[in-house]
Amino acid sequence: MADDQGTAQALQPVQVVPGPAVEAPETPVETLKTSSSASRRVRARLARRMTAQRSTISPVLEPLVAVHKEFYPKANLSIVQRAFEVADQRHASQLRRSGDPYITHPLAVANILAELGMDITTLVAALLHDTVEDTGYTLEALSEEFGDEVGHLVDGVTKLDRVVLGSAAEGETIRKMITAMARDPRVLVIKVADRLHNMRTMRFLPPEKQARKARETLEVIAPLAHRLGMASVKWELEDLSFAILHPKKYEEIVRLVAGRAPSRDTYLAKVRAEIISTLGASKIKATVEGRPKHYWSIYQKMIVKGRDFDDIHDLVGIRILCDEIRDCYAAVGVVHSLWQPMAGRFKDYIAQPRYGVYQSLHTTVVGPEGKPLEVQIRTRDMHRTAEYGIAAHWRYKEAKGRNGVLHPHAAAEIDDMAWMRQLLDWQREAAEPGEFLESLRYDLAVQEIFVFTPKGDVITLPTGSTPVDFAYAVHTEVGHRCIGARVNGRLVALERKLENGEFVEIFTSKAPNAGPSRDWQQFVVSPRAKTKIRQWFAKERREEALEAGKDAMAREVRRGGLPLQRLVNGESMAAVARELHYIDVSALYTAIGEGHVSARHVVQRLLAELGGIDQAEEELAERSTPTTMLRRQRSTDDVGVSVPGAPGVLTKLAKCCTPVPGDAIMGFVTRGGGVSVHRTDCTNTASLQQQAERIIEVLWAPSSSSVFLVAIQVEALDRHRLLLDITRALADERVDILSASVTTSGDRVAISRFTFEMGDPKHLGHLLNVVRNVEGVYDVYRVMSAS
């Protein structure tokens, strides 16, 4: 510790305060000539001292110093150099996961804060923010060397690192800490900058830790940056987290945005030119620019609002920066004179700032080509605040100080920010630490409420949610079977709106056929509840149509005096379904039930498939004899597999694993005397090997007539006509689809599975690439089972 103190004394900053008062004892003022000479000497000494000060700044600090000087030209940065040396010495033996010296992290955090325009005290705290937690440097020693203010900031960041938002057991700790931070928000700003650099270098951590940190960033840190008004930091945190948590979806969004770039840029250039021309004619000085696109925001709008990519307005956005507030309102008039404003889309955040920080005018108009165009209009000062939030706010407060040094009471002035005031109000009003913690955590989620299950679990819902929304948030089946609700111990109507902090209990029906009511669609507000209810009724209609179709087919076959079970078998119906352009047999039955095709027509196609009534009767009789069935093997049934020592034995490729040439295979003798061919890694291998006497060797022997069953799975961002585009891509490659299934998850990811026959599996790689190029598809691969 003594060595540290010695270093600190050697690097004690030279205080340079301009004006004659400092040099008065050395400056005679008897004559004008003498005074002029003395002034030259003072300037020379000041120049030498400033040169000496600059020479003590480490080269690695020069970028930070250059940025900070833009905001605080007269700042004395000697203390920053001293903090860097202490941090460098304390972290000397430590490395980051990337292999870089640990000091690169606090230095990067300080650089981020310098770019935000934070004061010297914050930069010093940033350089030292990990020394107390990760080295033997005590908080007392740090405070003694750099002052109580720096010590307070470092202590706040250290405590924030030691707790996990959301743990009720830590409620009291977080309550005290957040209250302290509300009085000095720089602690929060340092933490946000710390997380931003960690997210930028997250690739060096294990995947599971990356995912945990990214999830915490999305749920807590990014909303915190949003509440602090730090938009530029918030966007970057969200996009970095998105790339870690959903890499394939992230890449697909990036690809989609890049694909629209040329047409979008042309469109924006046309819009900018028109706005600039009209503003000039109206004598309004302003800068017009395109707004950057943020991938997480685009993805969220696709999920939460259920929009297709092409319908997202944010892809085309304009920002107008004016000199004066009155010009902002005049600019709105200009924009509305050019294009028709959309009803309900004008918001005045200048008159009513959001969170007490953000100010801007928002409007959406029907722009050229009938496309929605989002426009933000603000002053340049408002724009700096919008980008840097409380950091910019703090910078303006600091401007009242001297040489960038914090005014002792400046922190109190931050209390004019609404959200910071709210934190202090919660501290006073919350009866329990857990109550305060919940107020903090869930207020970070804009336009959401939190309610509790009977067991005390927290469920977050959109504002205006009902018990039905709550039921679906708990589980889909709870939602489907919901018949009543009790809120805070009292029975309530299902359409009653829930409020923050309420305890909700759902009563469910035990009836096997229980389901949602169509009336629910009129009052539920959560996307999940709306989707699940809509899916239930769609599935119910499909199931009813499917059963009606089967009944109609049975009646029609019996009317013709034909054997139902033998005629309506999977192979024959699948052939007719393909001929009539249905993706599978179930779709054909559903079409019959819905009246799109008649049962009589389908039976006629079945008979034609079998060569007429006479041939059909003969064919059906032949199928009924197992021995005849084994002998019957047309050339088109060549599966490309031979059994050594047993030529002519009927072989069949197992549908449970759909082997193709190149796969390791094994044979299993069926009870009918044929051989079922499985992949050696088939999910049924373990059970088959329990009957080892029935396992035989088989070899691939494909010929030009061999046909193989292949199943692929396609994962894509759901959109209109997605299935059509995928099936069209397969059809263009002359692929005959035997079956297809599609499911859509709550986050608008469509998972499709297709089963088809291929003559040469070597072409599968090319086929997968073709499907992968369909818009919205981010992954496609072969799967084992065709079922």
From Swiss-Prot:
<dbReference type="InterPro" id="IPR043519">
    <property type="entry name" value="NT_sf"/>
</dbReference>
<dbReference type="GO" id="GO:0008728">
    <property type="term" value="F:GTP diphosphokinase activity"/>
</dbReference>
<dbReference type="Pfam" id="PF19296">
    <property type="entry name" value="RelA_AH_RIS"/>
</dbReference>
<comment type="pathway">
    <text>Purine metabolism; ppGpp biosynthesis; ppGpp from GTP: step 1/2.</text>
</comment>
<keyword id="KW-0067">ATP-binding</keyword>
<dbReference type="GO" id="GO:0005524">
    <property type="term" value="F:ATP binding"/>
</dbReference>
<feature type="domain" description="TGS">
    <location>
        <begin position="447"/>
        <end position="508"/>
    </location>
</feature>
<feature type="compositionally biased region" description="Polar residues">
    <location>
        <begin position="1"/>
        <end position="12"/>
    </location>
</feature>
<feature type="domain" description="ACT">
    <location>
        <begin position="711"/>
        <end position="785"/>
    </location>
</feature>
<dbReference type="InterPro" id="IPR012676">
    <property type="entry name" value="TGS-like"/>
</dbReference>
<feature type="domain" description="HD">
    <location>
        <begin position="102"/>
        <end position="199"/>
    </location>
</feature>
<feature type="region of interest" description="Disordered">
    <location>
        <begin position="618"/>
        <end position="641"/>
    </location>
</feature>
<dbReference type="InterPro" id="IPR004811">
    <property type="entry name" value="RelA/Spo_fam"/>
</dbReference>
<dbReference type="InterPro" id="IPR045865">
    <property type="entry name" value="ACT-like_dom_sf"/>
</dbReference>
<dbReference type="Pfam" id="PF02824">
    <property type="entry name" value="TGS"/>
</dbReference>
<dbReference type="Pfam" id="PF13328">
    <property type="entry name" value="HD_4"/>
</dbReference>
<keyword id="KW-0418">Kinase</keyword>
<dbReference type="InterPro" id="IPR007685">
    <property type="entry name" value="RelA_SpoT"/>
</dbReference>
<dbReference type="InterPro" id="IPR033655">
    <property type="entry name" value="TGS_RelA/SpoT"/>
</dbReference>
<dbReference type="Pfam" id="PF04607">
    <property type="entry name" value="RelA_SpoT"/>
</dbReference>
<dbReference type="GO" id="GO:0016301">
    <property type="term" value="F:kinase activity"/>
</dbReference>
<dbReference type="GO" id="GO:0005886">
    <property type="term" value="C:plasma membrane"/>
</dbReference>
<dbReference type="InterPro" id="IPR012675">
    <property type="entry name" value="Beta-grasp_dom_sf"/>
</dbReference>
<dbReference type="InterPro" id="IPR006674">
    <property type="entry name" value="HD_domain"/>
</dbReference>
<dbReference type="InterPro" id="IPR003607">
    <property type="entry name" value="HD/PDEase_dom"/>
</dbReference>
<comment type="function">
    <text>In eubacteria ppGpp (guanosine 3'-diphosphate 5'-diphosphate) is a mediator of the stringent response that coordinates a variety of cellular activities in response to changes in nutritional abundance. This enzyme catalyzes the formation of pppGpp which is then hydrolyzed to form ppGpp.</text>
</comment>
<dbReference type="InterPro" id="IPR004095">
    <property type="entry name" value="TGS"/>
</dbReference>
<dbReference type="GO" id="GO:0015970">
    <property type="term" value="P:guanosine tetraphosphate biosynthetic process"/>
</dbReference>
<comment type="similarity">
    <text>Belongs to the RelA/SpoT family.</text>
</comment>
<feature type="region of interest" description="Disordered">
    <location>
        <begin position="1"/>
        <end position="40"/>
    </location>
</feature>
<protein>
    <recommendedName>
        <fullName>Probable GTP pyrophosphokinase</fullName>
        <ecNumber>2.7.6.5</ecNumber>
    </recommendedName>
</protein>
<keyword id="KW-0808">Transferase</keyword>
<dbReference type="Pfam" id="PF13291">
    <property type="entry name" value="ACT_4"/>
</dbReference>
<dbReference type="GO" id="GO:0005525">
    <property type="term" value="F:GTP binding"/>
</dbReference>
<dbReference type="InterPro" id="IPR045600">
    <property type="entry name" value="RelA/SpoT_AH_RIS"/>
</dbReference>
<keyword id="KW-0342">GTP-binding</keyword>
<dbReference type="InterPro" id="IPR002912">
    <property type="entry name" value="ACT_dom"/>
</dbReference>
<keyword id="KW-0547">Nucleotide-binding</keyword>
